[in-house]
C-alpha cells in the first residue's frame, strides 16, 4: 500500500503524458478559468435581444389598447352606462379582450426570448426567471375568463333575463374581484421573474448598469404593489400610480435592446 501511495504521483504524471489527454485537460482548465470572464455574445443572442425589444413593445401596445376601452375609458361610468356601451359595441369589446389575452401570451414568449439571451450568464437563475414569467403568463391569461364573463353580464343587462339590475351589478363586482386577484398574482410572478432577468443583465453588463439596476428596483416595486393590491383591492387604482416607473423602465429596455442591442462584458482586469 505504501508503495502504491509513493508511486501514485508518477502514475498521474504518466497519465497526462498519454497523447491527447494533456491537451484535453488543458482545454478544460482554460474553459473553466475563462468562464464568467469571457461573455462572448453570439449572433443568436443578438437576434433574440432585438426580438425581446419588439415583444416588449408589442405587449405594452396590446395591453394599453385592450384596457383603454374596457377599463380606462370606463372610469367613473355607472354600471348602466358601461353595460350600454358594451352591448352597443360588442365586437369592439371582445376585440379588446382578445388584445389583452394576446398581451398575456406575449409575456410567455418574452420569457423564452430573454431566457435564450441570458442563459449563458447563469443557467439556473435564467431557468427560474423563465418559470416565473411563464407562470405569470398562464395566471394572467386564465384570469381573463372573469372579464369574458363580465362582458356576458353586460350584454344580459340589455335583454330580458332572470336577473335584476342590482343582481347583475353584484355579479359584475364579483367577476371584477376575481379578475383583479388573478392579475395581481400574475404581477407578483412577473415582477419576480423580471427582477432575476435584470439581475442577469446587470451581471453580464449586456445593458447599462443604471438601466439594469433600475429594472431590479422597479421589478421589486411591482411585487410589493401587487401584494398590497391583493390585500387591499379597494386601493388598486391608487397603487397603480407606483407602477409608472416600471412601465418607463420596460420601454427604455425595449428601445435599448431593439436599437442598441447587447453590449459585450468588459474583460476582467488581471
PLM region spans:
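Serine/threonine-rich, low-complexity intrinsically disordered segments
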Residues: 7-9, 20
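Short, Lys/Arg-enriched N-terminal segments with co-localized hydrophobic residues
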Residues: 18-38
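Hydrophobic, aromatic-enriched alpha-helical segments typical of multi-pass transmembrane helices
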Residues: 34-270
